[in-house]
Amino acid sequence: MVDQLQGTWKSVSCDNFENYMKELGVGRASRKLGCLAKPTVTISTDGDLITIKTKSIFKNKEISFKLGEEFEETTPSGRKSKSTVILDNDSLVQVQDWDGKEATICRRLVDGKMVVESAVNNVTCTRTYQRV
């Protein structure tokens, strides 16, 4: 499944992103900038190491990890979290834990597009990406 997600993807649609960021505690100005961003995501592998690079006008971010192994990351909003990524059916599922809270980011292929669903509490954001 990771092989199918490898490559470069450009954001083509976004639903409920501002509310998702608000639920994360992101300030108003950063939420507005984040909503304007049309990120490009590149997913690659080197053996069992997976790297996800996200580039936008707002911020750039890179994480590298092995499936099932916890790692530390700093999110674009500045949160420091412990994350674990697993392969669940046809989805790459990332769980971020910080300060007793949890967010889930699920990446999967739907009709040739990468769909990323991010959820915290009862707020879900869906971003759709097209292969570049």
Curated annotation (Swiss-Prot):
Isomerase listed as a keyword: no
**Which Pfam family, giving just one, matches this sequence?**
Lipocalin
Under Gene Ontology molecular function, one entry of this record is: lipid binding
Tissue occurrence: Highly expressed in adult retina and testis.
Q: Which domain of life is it from?
A: Eukaryota
By its UniProt entry, which Gene3D superfamilies does this protein fall under?
2.40.128.20
Q: Which UniProt keywords apply?
A: Lipid-binding, Transport
Q: Which CDD domains match?
A: FABP12
Keyword Cell membrane attributed: no
Provide the binding site for a fatty acid: 107, 127-129
The family line of this record is: Belongs to the calycin superfamily. Fatty-acid binding protein (FABP) family.
- What is this protein's function? May play a role in lipid transport.
Q: How is this protein named in the record?
A: Fatty acid-binding protein 12
The organism is Mus musculus
Gene name, please? Fabp12
